[in-house]
């Protein structure tokens, strides 16, 4: 049986090479890429400006398949969360956050996470596997065209774009799944695909120093760093990766990255934990840390979203405001992240949700297989959004 090539796995250069293997010229790859990423098409017969001979070849050798949607929930504040099947009993979550002038999609890069930050529920489920390119970019593909379909907006460049910003802040550490992550980033930025600005795509890392340097050369998008502590002793306990890449190395990597970044600052994410990292002294240590390293930055303070296994609690709002004020008085731009989607477990640090209960996921997948056997393989799947 011939293995079908998932065209969502291919970046622009790879798609040109693939078309070359089929005896086609490079311009066919560009046409194909537009159909896939600008029109959301998965049916080759719908790609009417492709030669029929090419469509026939593709129908027997290729497929366009994003992860199937297991569940779809919308929060009272408009935040929308999809649980998607990435196979072998694994599922990841994708979250859309609508705002007045933009729509941000938070995507996952791994099923589970090996970093195991103390305050993050995703890490508590352990690491299962890396996602493929198609599973990463497929989250954007699925979400963009599902949002358009929901609102009755036509596919293609003329239709109003629903996702204007992408943040790699979902499940997993992006820089520990480097090649698929970078390939997906390149597709996001390509004008023949999604055409997003580098300033509107943010990768968040817990601090994999060598890969930060590599990213600066391969695909320098906006950088966010999960900092969460003002000194090594504290960060060792909250972010175990710090034992391998301590703060002095991380700060130096951030400074090097800014030579190539689309923004002139790094965003430091800081989860506010009551009695752990939220004192004025911690804030003063942060000021000294970034000044000594000479890293232009802004801080995004994140109210902790509690979960039972953490043993941690959220800092009180007055404490968060006081902490922010210390930073701002030192001239550091500081924001406090709004808590969005917490009623559907879509808020920051909560992306384990239904995935954490592996038995329930297996039950849902078994039930889905039964329905597909009865009603056809496409039951419950978003397979064609171009019509």
From Swiss-Prot:
Molecular function GO labels: 4 iron, 4 sulfur cluster binding; metal ion binding; rRNA (adenine(2503)-C2-)-methyltransferase activity; rRNA binding; tRNA (adenine(37)-C2)-methyltransferase activity; tRNA binding
Residues binding S-adenosyl-L-methionine, per UniProt: 172-173, 204, 226-228, 305
Residues given in the record as [4Fe-4S] cluster binding sites: 113, 117, 120
Xref: PROSITE patterns: RADICAL_SAM
InterPro entries for this protein: Aldolase_TIM, Methyltransferase_A, RlmN_N, RNA_MTrfase_RlmN, rRNA_lsu_MTrfase_RlmN/Cfr, rSAM
Name listed for the protein in its UniProt record: Dual-specificity RNA methyltransferase RlmN
Comment field (misc): Reaction proceeds by a ping-pong mechanism involving intermediate methylation of a conserved cysteine residue.
Record-linked Gene3D superfamilies: 1.10.150.530, Aldolase class I
Disulfide-bonded cysteines: 106-348
Cofactor names: [4Fe-4S] cluster
SUPFAM superfamilies membership: Radical SAM enzymes
Location within or outside the cell: Cytoplasm
Positions annotated as active site in the UniProt record: 93 (proton acceptor), 348 (s-methylcysteine intermediate)
Start and end residues of each Radical SAM core domain: 99-343
Keywords: 4Fe-4S, Cytoplasm, Disulfide bond, Iron, Iron-sulfur, Metal-binding, Methyltransferase, rRNA processing, S-adenosyl-L-methionine, Transferase, tRNA processing
The enzyme's E.C. designation: 2.1.1.192
Family: Belongs to the radical SAM superfamily. RlmN family.
Biological function: Specifically methylates position 2 of adenine 2503 in 23S rRNA and position 2 of adenine 37 in tRNAs. m2A2503 modification seems to play a crucial role in the proofreading step occurring at the peptidyl transferase center and thus would serve to optimize ribosomal fidelity.
Species of origin: Janthinobacterium sp. (strain Marseille) (Minibacterium massiliensis)
HAMAP family in alphabetical order: RNA_methyltr_RlmN
């Amino acid at each position: 049986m011939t293995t079908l090539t998932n065209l969502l796995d291919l970046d622009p250069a790879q798609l040109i090479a693939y078309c070359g293997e089929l005896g086609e010229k490079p311009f066919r790859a560009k046409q194909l890429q537009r159909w896939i990423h600008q029109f959301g098409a998965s049916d080759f017969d719908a790609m009417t400006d492709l030669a029929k001979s090419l469509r026939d070849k593709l129908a027997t050798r290729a497929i366009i398949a994003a992860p199937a949607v297991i569940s779809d929930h919308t929060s009272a504040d408009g935040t929308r969360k999809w649980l998607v099947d990435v196979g072998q009993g694994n599922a990841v979550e994708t979250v859309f956050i609508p705002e007045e002038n933009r729509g941000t999609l938070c995507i996952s890069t791994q099923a589970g996470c090996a970093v195991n930050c103390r305050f993050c529920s995703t890490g508590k489920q352990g690491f299962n596997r890396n996602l493929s390119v198609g599973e990463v970019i497929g989250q954007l593909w699925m979400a963009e065209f599902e949002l358009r379909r929901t609102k009755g907006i036509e596919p293609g460049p003329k239709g109003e774009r629903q996702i204007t910003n992408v943040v790699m802040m979902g499940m997993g550490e992006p820089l520990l799944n480097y090649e698929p992550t970078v390939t997906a980033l390149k597709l996001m930025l390509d004008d023949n695909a999604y055409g997003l600005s580098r300033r509107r795509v943010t990768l968040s890392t817990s601090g994999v120093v060598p890969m930060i340097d590599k990213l600066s050369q391969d695909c320098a998008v906006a950088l966010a760093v999960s900092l969460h502590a003002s000194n090594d002793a504290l960060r060792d306990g909250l972010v175990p990766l710090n034992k391998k890449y301590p703060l002095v190395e991380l700060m130096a990597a951030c400074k090097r990255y800014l030579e190539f970044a689309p923004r002139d600052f790094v965003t430091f994410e800081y989860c506010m934990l009551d009695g752990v990292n939220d004192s004025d002294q911690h804030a003063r240590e942060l000021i000294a840390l970034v000044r000594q390293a000479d890293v232009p930055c802004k801080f995004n303070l994140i109210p902790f979203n509690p979960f039972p296994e953490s043993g941690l609690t959220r800092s009180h709002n007055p404490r968060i405001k006081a902490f922010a004020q210390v930073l701002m008085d030192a001239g550091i731009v500081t924001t406090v992240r709004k808590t969005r989607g917490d009623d559907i477990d879509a808020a920051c640090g909560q992306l384990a949700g239904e995935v954490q209960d592996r038995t329930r996921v297996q039950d849902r997948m078994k039930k889905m297989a039964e329905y597909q056997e009865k009603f056809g393989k496409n039951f419950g799947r978003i397979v064609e959004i171009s019509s």
